[in-house]
Amino acid sequence: MVYVVYIGKESTAGAAWELLDREGATAVTMRRLAKSVGITPMALYRHFEDRDGLLNTLADVGFEELAARAGGTAMPADAEQQLMKILDVFLDFALEKPRLFELMFLERREGARQFPEDFREGRSPTAKFVAAALERGMKEGSFRKDDVWEITFET
């Protein structure tokens, strides 16, 4: 008797999360992922265009989670303290999920947002928090006036 089992995008993404968390982005290959969920590598291409698409999906979910944390954090009134609070949220996330943070911010990924265009156009769900705190501080005189996005990526 032959059984057909449908492995959905959620199960493959879950297995990809486990690989990423245990071994880092270099371990997340289509072949290893397929083997871990019991399907052929070609079957994964129904859910993800390629390995870059898979890694970008994982990174995007991470950015959404980090943005939700930053957006859900009570912020102090002082711009300098607000910036420190946002950076604390980023640091806590990095310590809690180091491999994901590395994928999000340190790994070169095909299709990742490009500086400065994508950031100036508001396409980053996380950088906007740092930029907003810096801009506020510049307007209030807490920080010297400068290019907000250049400073955001130096922070």
What are these regions (language model features)?
Residues 71-100, 149-152:
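Hydrophobic alpha-helical connector segments
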Residues 8-16, 33, 58-66, 70, ...:
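Generic hydrophobic, amphipathic alpha-helix propensity
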Residues 11, 15, 19-53, 57:
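Helix-turn-helix
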